[in-house]
């Protein structure tokens, strides 16, 4: 396979010369010969300054980098207090359910029932331990501004659920985010390792992380009766949702390809991994493996998988042609050092800028 050729930008600067000249003839009497007075020609040389131009970068050779300024005001150990009031919504939004129902089923139960995950209407308010505070999302409101459902895969079987709170359009954002993911990490003894991992990633230029925040959650359940008080649900870890909004926030290409790996071993899967206009394309089957979070043109993905599964092509050539090798090496080393075994075929994203061939 041919390697990636670097294109050099050559700048040509034209040098021009401008000449100024004049001759004056003066006649002095009959006895003297004509005297020619020639003024000195002044030659003005126009100097051309050569501009220092940065070498044009070939997009396939640009390494993945995060936006450091995004984390400047982060306080790793701070705790934000959130108040969530849940109520029954309506059938059209799939929110006509009780809070008890939300906390009774795992994603596998929903698959067995053949239905979408239940949701409830929610009013999210942010404040301190005394209550919602002015200037924060939801302050002074009394009607729902969000929907709430469980999140996660195997963790959805735990007694303590993780929640996905989706703020409605035109209802504001929290730190520029409309999707608020709250993770309990019930089976993780320390409960803070996930946040610690993201905090450590911030110090590694070759990797891109996500913003995180400890959250103290209070929930008021109005789905079955009114007049109840807020119940203390303890500490959660909020993790930024990686989507087009997050790509833009992190200085990445929001128009690029982005896939969330749900269950995928990087085989070709020709009967499932197809382009949208191919016969037999099934988006539901596709997203059981790879959830589409960015551009829906799958050509680049298919090209990469085809070469990766062609054993006549050396793995070194495949990596060079299709992947940011620096990012992969650092990512793998980090997972090994952290003892993370849950990102082999899931819980990871594939990203590629729009006009790049590199993942």
Q: How does the language model describe each region?
A:
Residues 84, 165, 321-359:
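Active-site acidic catalytic loop and adjacent metal/ATP-binding pocket
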Residues 189-222:
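A conserved helix-loop-beta module that forms one wall/lid of the active-site cleft
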Residues 120-184, 293-300:
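Conserved oxyanion/phosphate-binding beta-strand-loop segments in alpha/beta enzyme cores
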Residues 2-10:
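Bacterial N-terminal signal peptides that target proteins for export
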Residues 169-171, 207-210, 226-333, 341:
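Internal "kinase-insert"/substrate-recognition segments embedded within catalytic cores
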Residues 151, 220, 351-355:
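Short beta-strand micro-motifs enriched in acidic
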Residues 11, 16-141:
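Regulatory N- and C-terminal appendages and interdomain linkers associated
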Residues 114, 159, 187-195, 292-299, ...:
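Soluble non-cytosolic domains of exported or imported proteins
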């Amino acid at each position: 396979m041919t390697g990636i050729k670097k294109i050099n930008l050559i700048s040509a600067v034209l040098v021009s010369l401008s000449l100024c000249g004049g001759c004056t003839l003066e006649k002095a009497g009959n006895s003297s010969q004509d005297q020619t007075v020639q003024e000195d020609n002044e030659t003005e040389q126009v100097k051309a300054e050569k501009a220092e131009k940065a070498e044009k970068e070939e997009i396939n050779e640009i390494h993945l980098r995060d936006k450091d300024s995004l984390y400047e005001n982060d306080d790793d150990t701070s705790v934000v207090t959130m108040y969530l009031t849940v109520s029954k919504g309506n059938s059209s939004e799939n929110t006509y359910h009780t809070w008890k129902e939300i906390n009774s089923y795992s994603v596998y139960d929903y698959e067995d029932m053949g239905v979408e995950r239940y949701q409830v209407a929610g009013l999210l308010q942010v404040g301190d331990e005394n209550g919602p505070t002015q200037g924060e999302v939801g302050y002074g409101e009394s009607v729902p501004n969000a929907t709430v459902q469980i999140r996660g895969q195997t963790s959805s079987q735990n007694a303590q659920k993780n929640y996905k709170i989706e703020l409605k359009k035109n209802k504001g954002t929290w730190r520029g985010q409309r999707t608020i993911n709250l993770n309990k990490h019930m089976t993780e003894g320390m409960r803070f390792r996930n946040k610690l991992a993201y905090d450590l990633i911030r110090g590694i230029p070759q990797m891109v992380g996500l913003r995180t925040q400890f959250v103290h959650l209070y929930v008021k359940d109005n789905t079955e009766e009114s007049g109840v008080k807020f119940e203390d649900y303890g500490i959660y870890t909020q993790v930024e949702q990686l989507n087009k909004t997050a790509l833009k926030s992190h200085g990445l290409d929001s128009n690029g390809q982005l896939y969330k790996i749900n269950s995928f071993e990087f085989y070709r899967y020709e009967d499932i991994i197809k382009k949208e206009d191919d016969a037999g394309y099934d988006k539901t089957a596709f997203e059981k493996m790879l959830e589409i979070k960015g551009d829906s043109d799958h050509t680049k993905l298919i090209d990469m998988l085809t070469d990766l599964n062609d054993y006549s092509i050396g793995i070194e050539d495949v990596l060079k042609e299709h992947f940011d090798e620096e990012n992969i090496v650092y990512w793998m080393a980090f997972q090994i050092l952290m003892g993370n075994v849950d990102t082999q075929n899931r819980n990871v994203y594939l990203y590629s800028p729009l006009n790049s061939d590199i993942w």
